[in-house]
Amino acid sequence: MTAAAAEAPRWLTPAELADWRPLGGLLLKLPAALDTQMQRDSGLSHFEYLVLASLSEAPGRTRRMSALATLASGSLSRLSHVVKRLEGKGWITRQACQEDGRYTNAVLTDAGWEKVVASAPGHVEAVRSLILDALTEGELAQLGDIARRILTRLDSTGDVRAAFPAAVSTP
């Protein structure tokens, strides 16, 4: 028997459990609420919006598919299916990477840019009404600090902006 197997599990204390349960509920319900808003207002899934928004912030509105999958926290296979749907709507095109032909780039079209610009206000309002309006300025700063600390454990880059782009005003 290994030392790790001999150690007792680190069960949650009642206080930890009392804080974990609402956080777990938030982690389940918030994505669904954001997805519902995006579907209702823009006809996009939240994942599709994140893909379009990420491209809207990239230099030349272009990213490698592999980098886009990482940024959107999805598999390359899932991203490929989403990009195919977005291509069908004329919002994205795929092009061979000029720097390295082994890669494929996703490029946001002008119509895709217009879709992001049209979709962003509803998304921002949902973020405000569901999260920001419920917190004081100090609580929001504290939540941001906590989220960055946890995100760094999940993704060593800690790149929050890449994970949730375009929650700011568009030019």
List PLM regions with ranges.
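C-terminal regulatory/oligomerization modules of transcriptional regulators
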Residues: 1-14, 137-171
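N-terminal helix-turn-helix DNA-binding core of bacterial DNA-binding proteins
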Residues: 32-75, 162
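N-terminal leader segment of winged-helix/HTH proteins
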Residues: 1-42, 89-91, 170-171
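Short, hydrophobic-biased segments on the C-terminal half of alpha helices
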Residues: 65, 83-84
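Hydrophobic alpha-helical core bundles mediating ligand binding, dimerization, or RNAP-core interactions
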Residues: 16, 20-38, 52, 116-135, ...
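Charged, amphipathic alpha-helical coiled-coil/dimerization segments
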Residues: 2-8, 84-142
